[in-house]
Amino acid sequence: MGKKMSLILGAFLSVFLLVACSSTGTKTAKSDKLKVVATNSIIADMTKAIAGDKIDLHSIVPIGQDPHEYEPLPEDVEKTSNADVIFYNGINLEDGGQAWFTKLVKNAQKTKNKDYFAVSDGIDVIYLEGASEKGKEDPHAWLNLENGIIYSKNIAKQLIAKDPKNKETYEKNLKAYVAKLEKLDKEAKSKFDAIAENKKLIVTSEGCFKYFSKAYGVPSAYIWEINTEEEGTPDQISSLIEKLKVIKPSALFVESSVDRRPMETVSKDSGIPIYSEIFTDSIAKKGKPGDSYYAMMKWNLDKISEGLAK
């Protein structure tokens, strides 16, 4: 009986050690992947499109939330501290002064252009109205697909530098992704070229479509200029309504990541319908329309062109 029990215990210990070693091996393999942090869902999605399953990816600002102003969670602090590479937008979105990202990387003892990189590097910056100095940049450069391509190339460059063993995968995925974005950009320009000039006006809550306007030849109007300002004050709303009496667009649009009520007031008082919700600072939740950078841009381009052509 004692011998039999010893054999059973021996077998059990062998299985236990095998499972433990297997589990440890899995954890080691997982930890071997490049640890990447992106500040928001748009940058995270671009990174995922290029890297696939070659990295461990963490996105800081949750889907649907405003990346302009955010309070990092303990998990964000931990992931940032342990990251091999961090991607952020820059140009006045989440950085500068006492901005949340500036404090986050400082506390994590990370170094710019060594540990964290602005994916907007190299774009032609557009400034807020009446401004031209640092800290007054319009951050929404990704709303021009040509800039989205620049973002993607910057991401791929740093992934390759940090993880050269997966260079071939990153280059292959980048090439396919850029081709996809270029095709959509070309289609978008054709769509907006076909719309009458007197119908071209994008009206949104935040004045975030300057890059889009420049790329696709469609002027924009808004209630407030950037989400770090007061949003939807009576003066802002009445000022836009007065403009709309002169311009008379066929449709209004409201962003998925802002309070709808100011634009609903504009719609009610101006008599102009809200045609569609559109995406600016965040992609949609998985499985919903607009759940990737490509999908959100396609949605925006389709809905805006449809609304203006009415």
From Swiss-Prot:
CDD domains: PsaA. One of its GO terms (cellular component) is plasma membrane. Residues 1-20 form the signal peptide. Its main location: membrane. It is a lipid-anchor. PANTHER family: HIGH-AFFINITY ZINC UPTAKE SYSTEM PROTEIN ZNUA-RELATED, METAL-BINDING PROTEIN HI_0362-RELATED. This is Iron ABC transporter substrate-binding lipoprotein MtsA. It comes from Streptococcus pyogenes serotype M6 (strain ATCC BAA-946 / MGAS10394).
